[in-house]
Regions:
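Short, low-complexity disordered leader/linker segments with a strong preference
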Residues: 1-51, 126-131, 343-344
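Hinge/cleft segment of the Venus flytrap/periplasmic-binding protein
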Residues: 36-50, 203-206, 295-344
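Extracytoplasmic "Venus flytrap"
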Residues: 38-71, 75, 79, 84-101, ...
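Hydrophobic alpha-helical segments within soluble ligand-binding/sensing domains
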Residues: 46-47, 95, 152-179, 194, ...
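Short, solvent-exposed amphipathic alpha-helices that sit
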Residues: 63-78, 161-165, 190-210, 225, ...
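Short beta-strand elements in bilobed, periplasmic/extracellular small-molecule ligand-binding domains
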Residues: 77-89, 180-182, 203-223
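Hydrophobic alpha-helical
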Residues: 109-110, 114-130, 199, 214, ...
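Flexible loop/hinge segments that line or gate small-molecule binding clefts
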Residues: 118-119, 124-160, 171, 276-289, ...
């Protein structure tokens, strides 16, 4: 990558700065719709005048989405926000339709999953800004939208997280050039896919061979649908050493994948992202070996808090990288109780 900074890059950066300043000014103006506090003690329901829609991403009973929603619900209770949690079954088109409805209803603030990407979200973010609706984002960062219209991001740096997971797997498991990996990547949406694709890149740079299988995000709503997909991929690549899963909802069925393909405990490495009660059980039984924790509870709690603070206090948006390191066979017991409680 060249270190030279071209005129085009400079102009693009100056445009981003200009848009960021404009978005900040619009956020400050948006606070005028909410009564200003009259003292330093905000009280128990200090955000009760703020009507908010918060997007949890997946199905209401979903593992990852359930933890995100738990974080949001705790923040709603702590702030008194007048908030509704929206579930989308990881259907990005549904997210866009629901967002359009949220804007049409004229809510004060929206905590939005960034999965639909810049192109889909940009016109709706513009509408929200024109109506004075605050927006912030969680789990996937629509960086172009935020550069233009403002808003914070609470979630992991996806590309960095995926590459770090692959490097840790190489270190822990002694993977070497020529070893084979299967990586499930949500190919249709690179804003979301960059995490798993980052793992692929690191493996290939290490000299490993990688088979990519398409990970439609909708699989997360019914994870058992991926079992025959992985079974077929493993049958076609019997020397596979390691599988990379695209999230906790899929990795929840790691034991089923291994057994369906004829593997016993610890006979094939399975790694991925996030924790859950099922993943803790899979660690115990030898079917999951490494995961990168992105603290989904914070991805629910902090966006609600951020929107309340901006609406009531005029503060800037919260930006937080929630990546928290690795859970593996040596340390999973330290987080098991929280994972079993649906908090990690």
């Amino acid at each position: 990558i060249s270190n030279r900074y071209s005129k085009t890059n400079w102009e693009g950066t100056m445009k981003s700065i200009k848009y960021g300043l404009a978005a900040l000014f619009s956020l400050q103006l948006a606070t005028t719709a909410v009564a200003a506090p009259t003292g330093q003690d905000l009280g128990a329901n200090w955000c009760s005048d703020v009507k908010m829609h918060f997007y949890a991403g997946g199905p209401e009973a979903g593992g990852f989405a359930g933890i995100v929603a738990a974080g949001a619900m705790n923040a709603i209770r702590d702030t008194g926000a007048d908030a509704e949690i929206i579930y989308s079954e990881w259907d990005f088109e549904k997210m866009v339709r629901q967002l359009r409805e949220s804007i049409g209803l004229g809510v004060d603030a929206i905590g939005m999953m960034g999965h639909p990407g810049d192109d889909a979200l940009m016109p709706l973010a513009k509408q929200a800004a024109e109506k004075g609706i605050l927006m912030t984002y969680q789990n996937v960062d629509p960086a172009g939208v935020r550069a233009r219209f403002g808003g914070g991001y609470v979630g992991a740096n996806l590309a960095t997280q995926g590459k770090a997971l692959a490097r840790e797997a190489i270190r822990q498991f002694g993977l070497k050039a020529g070893d084979h990996a299967i990586v499930m990547v949500p190919i249709g949406d690179y804003a979301r896919a960059q995490r798993e694709d980052g793992a692929r890149i690191v493996f290939e740079e290490h000299g490993m061979t990688v088979t990519v299988v398409d990970g439609n995000p909708a699989y997360a709503s019914d994870p058992n649908t991926v079992i025959p997909i992985f079974t077929a991929a493993l049958s076609a690549n019997p020397k596979t050493k390691i599988i990379v899963h695209p999230g906790s909802d899929i990795m929840n069925v790691a034991e089923g994948i291994a057994k369906a393909a004829g593997y016993g405990p610890n006979e094939i490495l399975q790694i991925g992202f996030d924790t859950s009660p099922q993943i803790m059980t899979a660690f115990e039984k030898g079917y999951v070996h490494l995961t990168s924790d992105q603290q989904p509870f914070l991805q629910g709690y902090l966006p609600v808090l951020s929107l309340c603070q901006t609406a009531v206090l005029g503060t800037g948006a919260i930006n937080q990288d929630t990546g928290a390191g690795f859970v593996d066979t040596n340390n999973y017991k330290a987080v098991k109780a929280l994972a079993d409680a649906g908090l990690r």
